[in-house]
Amino acid sequence: MSTESKCPFAGGAYANTEAGAKGNRDWWPKQLNLDILHQHSSLSNPLEENFDYASEFQSLDLDAVVKDLHALMTTSQDWWPADFGHYGGLFIRMAWHSAGTYRIYDGRGGASRGAQRFAPLNSWPDNVNLDKARRLLWPIKQKYGRKISWADLMILAGNVALESMGFKTFGFGGGREDIWEPEKDINWGPETTWLGDERYSGNRELANPLGAVQMGLIYVNPEGPNGNPDPLASARDIRETFARMAMNDEETVALIAGGHTFGKTHGAAPASHVGLEPEGASIEEQGLGWKNSFGTGVGKDAITSGLEVIWTPTPTQWDMSYLETLYGYEWELTKSPAGAHQWKPKGDAGAGTVPDAFDAKKRHQPSMLTSDIALRTDPAYDKICRDFMAHPDKYADAFARAWYKLTHRDMGPITRYLGPLVPKEELIWQDPVPAVDHELVNDADVEALKAEVLASGLTIPQLVSTAWAAASSFRGSDRRGGANGARIRLEPQKNWEANQPAELAKVLAKLEGIQQKFNGAQQGGKKISLADLIVLAGNAGVEAAAKKAGHDVKVPFAPGRTDATQEQTDAPTFAPLEPKADGFRNYAKKGLEDAAAYLLIDKAQLLTLTAPEMTVLVGGLRALGANYGQSKHGVFTSRPETLTNDFFVNLLDMNTAWAKSEKAAGEFEGRDRKTGQIKWTASIVDLVFGSNSQLRALAEVYATSDSTEAFVKDFVAAWTKVMNLDRFDLKK
């Protein structure tokens, strides 16, 4: 018998642990990805289940952390020396790139989960050497432990970097909780190579929901589109990508000009000297990547972007020098030592005006990126730059506010912000709602109001659909939307196709009448908001439908929502929240019918639902008749508006044979196998609960004869969860 040792991987003994092993989605690429509904569970979180980060952060000596960060900025380490003796530029870039992945179309990305620590972000080409920034922060993270998350620390480090170089920031709010595994729900693009750009169609139209121009970039290619040094074309890319972060032209100029006031870029030699990124590097590198074989590999020999740019004469000081330099010279193309396109003053003007990052005896001329020259070339950006030069205080305020917005955009309302550095001013992009300034309804009021709603002539489908439309606008990604604020009665939500505007207006008018009658009859200032009444009315509909099925249930209700005004609502940035499809309502815009099942999973993930919660909600909402346009698709019951498990029972009935309908795309007909008569009609979303093996397993749970009570209980729990998704006041 051979005693020769062999690698166990070669024989496939541990193939299930190899990244290259084929998984189910390799065999069946079109399979639904339900994994995104179960990420970030307690099973991957090393902290105890009752860990309360908000309480830990509130007990933190934030002044001490800030003091330590200030000291870090100028304590250069030999293993990664500080440019100009100050790490400020590096930490600004780290914070910017942590926050800058946010995109408005689905609210994903951003700084609020500390995702830069994990793949793919930790290994993106645009994040080269930010692994070093996080390692520099590690002693501070180690010192304060669980009292400050990586997510908060990275943004705070960016703020302190700015402050330490003389800039006054707008404020800082803590409260970002770390995740412990990569985010599986984010579509970063279709490309399979770094810096690929298969995300365009037509005249360079960037696909939704993507926010960057190429795979692995935060925003734009600093050399210009695909490395083409065309400033006007670069300006177009800049405007598009920053708009996808909800930044206007003024905010865009302020961020670029303000950020490039500090530090430098690194391109000492060609990229051939740079090793693999952290996720691909050897084990002895211990999570670091991009090992550089040129010279010392660090300091003056560092290679990051391949560009070798120092923008200003004062790269560790806040001043007007970036704009003064940009407009102080005429610029011409040149190349960095790494061969990347960048710009220098014509005629070698400005020689000796810019310091060397490591040798006090050396001086250089300033240089710029194509994306910098774009600010001067584009007429709108140019006008803003000149205005900022004439009004330095306006410029500083614009940068402070834009930086605050950039780094806090995905945190939700200001009520979630923690710590003594939170500014008092509430801004429109934080989706403000009025504070409760009245006595709330009590249990007796709630019962009386539900009775009034049920006697109003409004149907169960109307009540349920309206509450669902309001609450399900919530996105767990950036904590926007939801029932609080009653924005369903405002632009743009009141006119969204999925909300059936004409029908919605009738329901809201009835509910407003009930609200006014109740509030007018109260003594002492007790009131119910329309936002509360919309949810309460939906609850009343669910309870009435459950009662028809023989179940006496009470749906939990917590008053305390208030009604926002149109002036408190940033209509343009709410527009991307409009659902393209909502499988819970059996709704899909024309042309998206075939993708409806995938979009259901995406919607469920944004609603923070698990697969069982999604399943029970779909089945229950079909029974309640909550379909868009009163469609009968998926209403597999002879007793509509009754909270039964009939959807699951009849979906799994083998006496029904399904076939595609010839009437419309994405529609199906269920016929009696014996008679051939049509029994039911369905959408792809309906049938996927019988087709997909995981969803069928869940459907079977709710189709059994002993599941009726569990079905109602689980539906009420999942319904209540959705109604309260934006009630951050209840979760403190």
Curated annotation (Swiss-Prot):
Keywords: Heme, Hydrogen peroxide, Iron, Metal-binding, Oxidoreductase, Peroxidase, Signal. The active site is at 97 (proton acceptor). Heme b binds at residue 260. Its EC number is 1.11.1.21. Belongs to the peroxidase family. Peroxidase/catalase subfamily. Homodimer or homotetramer. This is Catalase-peroxidase. It comes from Acidobacterium capsulatum (strain ATCC 51196 / DSM 11244 / BCRC 80197 / JCM 7670 / NBRC 15755 / NCIMB 13165 / 161).
